[in-house]
From Swiss-Prot:
Residues 406-428, 448-470, 481-500 are annotated as: Disordered. The chain crosses the membrane at residues 66-86, 102-122, 139-159, 183-203, 233-253, 287-307, 323-343. Disulfide bonds join C137-C215. This is Melanopsin. Belongs to the G-protein coupled receptor 1 family. Opsin subfamily. PANTHER family: OPSIN (PTHR24240). Residues 1-65, 123-138, 204-232, 308-322 are extracellular. It comes from Rutilus rutilus (Roach). GO terms for cellular component: plasma membrane. GO terms for biological process: phototransduction; visual perception. The gene is opn4.
Length: 500
């Protein structure tokens, strides 16, 4: 009711008591009912509308709608893209290896990140406030923390796997199986769960943030408990994993540089092919690095905001500065499938093979499709580097060129089992393959074999001749041939045994 509007033309002279009394009489219950209009101001009567315990932010409506539209696009892309990654890597036999279990796990974490975060965020943005209650807020924030931490730890495991495959390939032969990869992933999930549960037990809390349309852990409250949780969270799930990733790629850079130098020193026609395979390995390692960098870049703005509030400068942060970095962080779930679709040849070929309707969208050529899958069907009995370089190499040089245990890097993981390589099945998944293998010894037909009689010649003459004559002897190598046409062991992971 507006008193001024109902008595807009009534004026009383100063000191006129009769006029004042008449004005008060007009405000009686009868006139109040006749002049009553809906009042939209604050009121103490809430029996017609349920209370809203969560606060709201005074921002334009279009800000909520824009953020809601962006998060909806991110969610749809993340769900569809990561579902395709999971389907293709589980369907394709050449991609179904122990190392690729890390990639599938990353896609699973990103899939559930998009599935649990985007629809709720979008619905809350349409209502311009949090509408789902306290329990759903806690569950929503818990899922975001769990899947975000799991993605970071999985990327760390991928970097470590790449580093070991390139720097210590022989150490992985027979030591990496699906069971061991599954054990690593179990540790990753338990570690992520351990850092996501404390807010349920009073160490920090899960509360609305930013524009009050999403929830996260409480990093705005300046208390010792909240600050301790935030600081330890960033140390153990962001900075330490990031340091491990950087160390792994520094080791990869150094190993590839050393391998290139050693291969160039070998004057043989096959070294160029080995060098090309090494370049392919480096290319796939760079793709992995790109995925990791995009993930770190996506979470960096959110990290800066949280650490700023933890340092005691939360008054400098606006609702936009809290919500926009949260959207960017959740968008990290879409980088993985997009990068695969653009750069990973075997993934592109598998998509075109199992989902033909996407072949035109990804522009997969027939040549690319044939070349990608032909590598999985060829025999693994390829000539080794030692047998190709046998001519003109002395006994001592043959042992050195064949990469005896002191030269592990020459048998690099150019065809290792991770998704980042050109040839997907290798020695690191030896224990996961079937036992129907044929062990063969390959001996070059161009070698000169000393007869038994010649070995009984004068010892001094033979020693003198061996010291000056360049003799090529066969250096047997053990290669494994699988029963499956799609799973083969590359020569880069064969066990090279130098002959005496």
């Amino acid at each position: 009711m507006s008193h001024h509007s109902s008595w807009r033309g009534h004026h009383c002279a100063p000191g006129d008591n009769n006029c004042t009394a008449g004005f008060k009489e007009s405000l009686g219950s009868k006139n109040y009912k006749l002049l009553h209009v809906p009042f939209h101001g604050p009121t103490h009567s809430h029996h017609h509308e349920p209370p809203h315990p969560f606060p709201t932010v005074d921002v334009p409506d279009h800000a909520h709608y824009i953020i809601g539209a962006v998060i909806l696009i991110v969610g749809i892309t993340g769900v569809i893209g990561n579902a395709l990654v999971i389907y293709v890597f589980c369907r394709s036999r050449t991609l179904r290896t122990a190392g690729n279990m890390f990639v599938v796990n990353l896609a699973v974490a990103d899939f559930f990140m998009s599935l649990t975060q985007s629809p709720v965020f979008f619905a809350a943005s349409l209502h311009r406030r949090w509408i789902f209650g306290e329990r759903i807020c806690e569950l929503y924030a818990f899922c975001g923390a769990l899947f975000g931490i799991c993605s970071m730890m999985t990327l760390t495991a991928i970097a470590a796997d790449r580093c070991l495959a390139i720097t210590q390939p022989l150490a992985l032969v027979g030591n990496v199986s699906r069971r061991k990869a599954g054990a690593v992933l179990a540790v990753v999930w338990l570690y992520s769960l351990g850092w996501s549960l404390p807010p349920f037990f009073g160490w920090s809390a899960y509360v609305p943030e930013g524009l009050q349309t999403s929830c996260s852990w409480d990093y705005m409250t300046f208390t010792p408990s909240v600050r301790a949780y935030t600081i330890l969270l960033f140390i153990f799930v962001f900075f330490i994993p990031l340091g491990i990733i950087v160390s792994c790629y520094v080791g990869i850079f150094q190993a590839i540089r050393a391998m290139g130098k050693e291969i160039r020193e070998l004057d043989c026609g096959e070294t160029q092919k080995v060098y090309e395979r090494m370049q392919n390995e480096w290319k796939m390692a760079k793709i992995a690095l790109l995925v990791i960098l995009l993930f770190v870049i996506s979470w960096s703005p959110y990290s800066v905001v949280a650490l700023t509030a933890t340092a005691g400068y939360s008054h400098l942060l606006t609702p936009y500065m809290n919500s926009v970095p949260a959207v960017i962080a959740k968008a990290s779930a879409i980088h993985n499938p997009i990068i695969y679709a653009i750069t990973h040849p075997k993934y592109r070929a598998a998509i075109a093979r199992y989902i033909p309707v996407l072949r035109t969208i990804l522009r997969v050529k027939e040549k690319e499709l044939r070349s990608s899958f032909s590598s999985g069907s060829v025999s693994s009995r390829r000539p080794t580097l030692s047998s190709q370089c046998s001519l003109g190499v002395s006994i001592g040089n043959a042992a050195r060129a064949n990469g005896r245990w002191g030269k592990k890097r020459l048998s690099s993981a150019s065809d290792s089992d991770s998704c980042w390589t050109e040839s997907e099945a290798d020695g690191s998944s030896v224990s996961s393959l079937t036992f129907g293998r044929r062990v063969s010894t390959e001996i070059s037909t161009d070698t000169v074999i000393l007869s038994p009689g010649s070995s009984n010649s004068t010892a001094s003459g033979q020693k003198s001749e061996k010291a000056h004559k360049v003799v090529s002897v066969p250096v047997p190598s053990i290669t494994f041939e699988t029963d499956s046409a799609d799973e083969s062991l590359s020569d880069g992971k064969a066990l090279l045994l130098g002959g005496n």
